[in-house]
Amino acid sequence: MANISSPFGQNEWLVEEMYRKFRDDPSSVDPSWHEFLVDYNPESTQEATEPAVVKPAAAPAKPAPAPAPAKPAAGPPAAGNGSPAAAPSAKPAAAPAKAPAPPPAEGDEMQVLRGAAAAVVKNMSASLDVPTATSVRAVPAKLLIDNRIVINNQLKRNRGGKISFTHLLGYALVQAVKKFPNMNRHYLDVDGKPNAVTPAHTNLGLAIDLQGKDGKRALVVAGIKRCETMRFAQFVTAYEDIVRRARDGKLTAEDFSGVTISLTNPGTIGTVHSVPRLMAGQGAIIGVGAMEYPAEFQGASEERIAELGIGKLITLTSTYDHRIIQGAESGDFLRTIHQMLLADEFWDEIFRELSIPYLPVRWRPDNPDSIVDKNARIIELIAAYRNRGHLMADIDPLRLDKTRFRSHPDLDVCTHGLTLWDLDRSFKVGGCFAGPQNMKLRDVLSILRDTYCRHVGVEYTHILEPEQQQWLQQRVEAKHVKPTVAQQKYVLSKLNAAEAFETFLQTKYVGQKRFSLEGAESVIPMMDAAIDQCAEYGLDEVVIGMPHRGRLNVLANIVGKPYSQIFSEFEGNLNPSQAHGSGDVKYHLGATGVYLQMFGDNDIQVSLTANPSHLEAVDPVLEGLVRAKQDLLEHGETDTENQRAFSVVPMMLHGDAAFAGQGVVAETLNLANLPGYRVGGTIHIIVNNQIGFTTAPEYSRSTEYCTDVAKTIGAPIFHVNGDDPEACVWVARLAVDFRQRFNKDVIIDMLCYRRRGHNEGDDPSMTNPRMYDVVDTKRGVRKSYTEALIGRGDISIKEAEDALRDYQGQLEQVFNEVRELEKHGAQPSESVESDQMIPAGLATAVDKSLLARIGDAFLAVPDGFTTHPRVQPVLEKRREMAYEGKIDWAFAELLALGSLVAEGKLVRFSGQDTRRGTFSQRHSVIIDRHTREEFTPLQLLTTNKDGSPTGGKFLVYDSPLSEYAAVGFEYGYTVGNPDAVVLWEAQFGDFVNGAQSIIDEFISSGEAKWGQLSNVVLLLPHGHEGQGPDHTSGRIERFLQLWAEGSMTIAMPSTPSNYFHLLRRHALDGIQRPLIVFTPKSMLRNKAAVSDIKDFTEIKFRSVLEEPTYEDGVGDRNLVNRILLTSGKIYYEMVARKAKDKREDVAIVRVEQLAPLPRRRLRETLDRYPNAKEFFWVQEEPANQGAWPRFGLELPELLPEKLSGVKRISRRAMSAPSSGSSKVHAVEQQEILDTAFG
């Protein structure tokens, strides 16, 4: 008798065949079998495993003709499917006599069965000793088919591979066994007694059909062990491993033993219904038939089948050992599998396990609504995906919340009254897609999910312009073209460079801060693609602004900063000849390079601006810098729709927490479409590592996305999974295309993660343990992308390894070279003060005729222009002043700017209410009373009298109600165009502190930190006039505290002419340093604060001013014994008081330039008063504010022989700039004057 109890079951033939090969030639057998086969003995194994059974009665000596089979002993009634129950007798009836086989006919071919074929005979004969019965159940397969399509479509776009029907059915079988453990038992005789053995684990046997080299087929059954402990993904992995090793001949003895229940799927070859043989040692074998429509519908068309709601069926059979399993159990077991395959919970678990980012297809009854009704619902569904599809997109590479975005009611077909039965029905979708008028719901969903729910989530329906919506819709819904192999290799090369660079720095410079890009490496191929697309359009430059994270990587792999220079900065090996000022850390520095296309012939300039650690502070600076470059190129007017005008592209990188949290982001976005500020669209890339320093998103923003603020300007938003570099590249190119088509901002939100802490010394797991449990075990994007390319056959493993080794080799070579460079010891930083000196003899006076021409311009309104009746007198007065003198402050300012325009300078003037002026003093732009047509007089100065251009421009803009972004923009403009005259005016000087970060980080220290020069002018209305603490002070003390190394010029001129010369000197001296001017308010209409024409045509800026009586020789300096030093509009109050009191013993000296303090001029002026004994500094500001906190220290050092005892006259020290009461203000002001002249 066959050895039916062999531990290898029906695989015993294979083991014996291997043993024979091993015995003849051990090397012909896989080494994993050697230990088992070295002492294997088929005979002893058979004897040892032969079960102790009661021998059957002897067969007759001669075969009897057609003997009837023995009847079973009496027992319980038939159960389950009607199969008789096993007889309770332990002694089976005698086997019937076998009839002899008829002899072969003449011509028949005889073949002795050996090896596998003989083993099959043996196994099948042995199986006859197992009394079996079979249950059969037809199961709807439509849900199985549809969900498998969904799963495999998703896998195809991710890691590759497929889920088979057998994977799903096998897993369902294992889950059903948990509910029916008896199906996992098997029968065994022990010492002549029947036993039911319940194994500790479910070991699922897979019947695998193998084809040998000779073309013959053989069947092996290999087991997946302990599969009841596996989740679906683990089960699939184990399944694929068994099948792969079977195909490769790598199965081991362990794989063949211990199978407790088997699954066979003859349906793959079209078998609809099978009753497989059950081998000893198992309780059941489950057969899977082919999926077919019911026979009566197999001739129907697809359309008719869909219309009727007919689905395919799959037949499951359970052939079981009837001695230990009853028909009812088997039937319930199949029913459970049936129910499971239709259950929401079963599919939810599988979709979660495979990280499918949306809900499975649900089993629901067909909805009998009319096609007309459903057509409308299809349109609703399409609109829902366009609006909400991003909520179901698979954009989080960490998948920290696997259920958060898997569903939205609007995206559920059931919400729209549709079911799986509608998937294959055709509906009218005319106009919805660029394609046929009618489409199956399945195809509609495929387009919608491919477009909106894969690795890119798109938000664009908030855009108000239909043309832009339509353009985006057509682009994203079009079928994506797969990158070529060459393009894929190029993307991989950028990932190699990004990761290897970080790994290299981490290895070589352990513990040094660098704010690595690890976890977000896809931003490198993304930026590369965007710049490449800009080059494809033939644009002039891409200017990048970004925070410190990833900055070194961008410098190296995007801008092209030499590795040697970066490594030298890590070494601290700075070249003294390149030192400038105090410097800054390496991850704040900028650079410039040239980008050369890999797959094209164009190149483009690329630059990265310097930035501080103040997140997002660089945003408006970048925009201003780009606008300046665009204006310099003069490709067209930037305030029009001229495409060529925007040939310089700003690319701005952000962090997710900063983009949502920093108010300057909203301020900067608000500039996007404003005249005077628009740059034709910015490419925003958010490196969304889903965490602030340690703060999780739920604590850092109230919105769903960090990008929601960008909806305010109608910018399209693309959320993209950073683990899919191809998607990142596609989005980057699309973003540039949109920018070029519509000259608008585009937002790319690349979700990724931060491999390390905020910096390399930080441990993020202390505050974000769950996230970093995932991060610590996550494979990097380079590895996962490499595996995907190898898996798809696009590249070989060797090609991938060679490319990485080549890049690592380059880094190692440069590193060794840097280590050999001459090392320079650290030295104290040098001041930059001496780098720029005002040229001697600089003339700022102008010819009288130019003043007259500017005055005439204000009355040269166009024909038919209606000037407002309150403005007309102002214009007429200006012409009068230009010819007769007594020029006031506002006109002196316009004379300065107009003269610069006439001399070929670009003048840009902006601020809140700047065109008219906060105090209705400027009227630089005249508005027609009826038509709102605008007339700008100073623009007439852009041409000479003969009509030829001067080369100058006058650009004046009302800014948005913003300080931070507005000041940053103007600073950036001066960096981009150093020759421009750029002025920003605060509404009141008090409000400039809204831009304090720009002042601290850029204006006052940009030169010392980065060598970045600026000549921006800040005009800050300042003065105590009883208007309260928020309309009084431009905070002189703060600017003086920031001043050092000649970093700025700070002035508070007291005459219109001195202001005129100050502005002209600043524009013409060739020095690139900011100018801070504290301008007047009430003094704008002070009849004493005027200047004569000769003050504009004969002199220049004077940093120290005496009273005119002394300058004219009327006053006697020898009578003076008290000198009152002062600055600003209080001078006029002091002069009036002096005249009233007839105090010839008191002289008033004005310090017009507060910093740098004019030491020589001040010394010369004071020396003219030989009898002066008392020196006072008089200011309106409180004692702890204004110029005194600095001057109280600096004046005694300047002139110790005269000013060592200088005293202060001012308001008391105050926490606010002034009193809120105008009456208290008047008392305090009088007290200052009384003390000064007391």
Curated annotation (Swiss-Prot):
Keywords: Acyltransferase, Allosteric enzyme, Coiled coil, Decarboxylase, Lyase, Magnesium, Metal-binding, Multifunctional enzyme, Oxidoreductase, Thiamine pyrophosphate, Transferase, Tricarboxylic acid cycle. Its EC number is 2.2.1.5, 4.1.1.71, 1.2.4.2, 2.3.1.61. Residues 95-343 are annotated as: Succinyltransferase E2. Its cofactor is Mg(2+); thiamine diphosphate. It holds the Pfam family E1_dh. Residues 51-61, 71-98 have a biased composition (Low complexity). Residues 42-94 are annotated as: Linker. It catalyses: glyoxylate + 2-oxoglutarate + H(+) = 2-hydroxy-3-oxoadipate + CO2; 2-oxoglutarate + H(+) = succinate semialdehyde + CO2; N(6)-[(R)-lipoyl]-L-lysyl-[protein] + 2-oxoglutarate + H(+) = N(6)-[(R)-S(8)-succinyldihydrolipoyl]-L-lysyl-[protein] + CO2; N(6)-[(R)-dihydrolipoyl]-L-lysyl-[protein] + succinyl-CoA = N(6)-[(R)-S(8)-succinyldihydrolipoyl]-L-lysyl-[protein] + CoA. Homodimer. The 2-oxoglutarate dehydrogenase (ODH) complex contains multiple copies of three enzymatic components: 2-oxoglutarate dehydrogenase (E1), dihydrolipoamide succinyltransferase (E2) and lipoamide dehydrogenase (E3). Belongs to the 2-oxoacid dehydrogenase family. Kgd subfamily. This is Multifunctional 2-oxoglutarate metabolism enzyme. The gene is kgd.
